[in-house]
Structures are given as C-alpha cells and as structure tokens.
C-alpha cells in the first residue's frame, strides 16, 4: 500500500509554476533565459501600501486575527464591492484567504459531494480542474473557442448544465486569454443561469482592474441581482496592486457559504498573514491612481505582443480586452520541424523546444485545456519582450 494519498493520482502539479521554476533554474545555471510564463506584474508594490505594512509591524499589529480575516479588512472589502461593483455585503458575508486560490479551494471543499459537476470554460486557469478533483467533484469542460474570441456562448452553457451541476466557474478578464465579457455577453449567460436555480456561480474577478480600450468590467451578481444569493464573487490584491507575494484574496457571498468556508480555513491555514491584511486595507482604501497608469504600460506591451506575434510565421494572435496575457495559436507551426530536427507535433513540444533552442519560456496551451496555443505573460520589460519576440520569430521562421 502506498504511503501517499490516492487523491494525488487525480491531480498534477501546476504547469505555470513548473515553467517559471524551470526558467529560474536555467537562469541560475547561467543560461540566457527570458521568462514569459509568470502571472505577476513586474511593478513594485506601491509605497503607501508598504508603509502601511511597516506601520502595522512597528505598532505590534502582528497577532492572530479571526480565521477568515480581520474586521478592518472585511469592512474595506465591503466598501470596495459597493464602490466598484454596486454590491452590498456585510462583513459576515466576507471571506479573506491566503490568496484567491485558497478562497476558491475553500468554497469547493465546503460544497462539493461525490458526483457534483463544475462547469469550467476552456481555456481555463490551470488550477480550476484540479481543485475540483481534490474536492471530490467532476470538472465539466466547455470549449470557448478562438472563433468566439475565447468566450463561452449562452447556448454552450445551456447545453452543458445537467441536474448534477453545482457550480459554474466564470473568469473575466480571463487567465490565460485576457478575454473579457461585455455586459451584453454576460447578460446572455446570466439569463441561462436564471433558468437553472440549482447552479451556483463562482466569479473569479482577479483581473477586474486590468482592462484596456475603454472595456467596461462587470460581474455576474452586478448584472443580475437575483443571482446575488448564489454567487461567490472572488477577488484579491495580487494583480492590480502588484501584491502577488503578500497573499491576500477575498470573496463576498451568502453568509451560510462564507460560514462553511470559514470552518474549512479554521482547520487548515487559519488567518492570512496579519501584516498583509493591514497592507490590503491601505490598498483598497488608499489612492487608486497608479492603476490606470500601470494599465497604460500594460496596454503598450499588449499591443507590442499582438503585433510582433502576428508578424511571426505560423502564429496568429487575438487582441485581448484585459489581464496581461495573450494566447496565440500555433496552428501554422504544427507538423513542421525545428532546426534541431524535432517535429512540432503539439504545443507542449513547441514550448519545450522554444525554451531549449532560444531560451524563451512560455506555457503550452494544453495546460489550459485548449490547443494548439501557448500563453505569453507580457508583464515584463519592453526590452525583454522585444528580445523574446525576436527569438520566437527566428525560431518559427526556421521551421521546415
């Protein structure tokens, strides 16, 4: 009998973390590597937020808090939801975790039973299916194709719902594609959900503030107030506030769900880092002017990435509405051989050879459930982007 849990056979390590670690190892070994795999901003955490953390430390605000977060941050989150999303929550309806990933995991662990299904549009963030499996559920994948700009249609959602469906995971703007649903597109989905009152909505809004070209962000419970009682609206400070390592995610939802999630968290990590919570209060309540300034940089990089990738033989790339990713297709590269004689049979081989032959690290599309593609994070310097796309262009140009 194996010492390790049989549950581990159902899941795999995070491919995005694996790519980032591989790139870091090659750099440490002296290799010339440009990493386009990491899903985090290259900006520093704003100074006022760091000062708030320092102030908390100097004043001894470093003790335990309630298992799912301190009241001061819960109140700040309530203010954020009201200000940005027209959603009214009480502090008892707020859960704070060690990153958005823990919030999603807690919700699934608190609600899933054997046989329960969770609808996940593809391409998806790599952790969604594995978290469902760990919670004992069944991921049901619904392809949001490139022909529909990587967005799920109302008809697809309708056709995927069964009497076993418990959750629909919604992510806009999306990781890995950056696709954002307009109000009209989201309204069509909410109309379907209103016809199926047994289906709950898990809305991952982590990239809410990272949008471009006057795109108007919206979230399901905002669009359809009648969904409020069966929606968990998830967010965090990692992306918009350049606080990935501070590990603060949060959610608003029905009190009975939040209470169940608190029970899970009280028996796992207990409270998120207290100092990080005080920093998050300042992030949400403090000046927000740096966000549009950062977005100007992200938009410039997005436009650069889309142009240079579309100028590359065998690659085509859509222009996303948000986040800091592009998800180009490599359909025109499949079946060709590299200068090293390796046949590009799929996007995993493409990404592997790209790293080995050019030193550019990207994440292969199969990790996100839709191929043949790869994900590029353009949250890095213009210099690195230009050099990386130069190498990608050369690599693809030499395919035969």
Where are the regions that the model predicts?
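A glycine-/small-polar-enriched, mobile loop at the entrance of the PLP active site in fold-type I
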Residues: 37-40, 55-73
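Substrate/cofactor-recognition hotspot
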Residues: 8
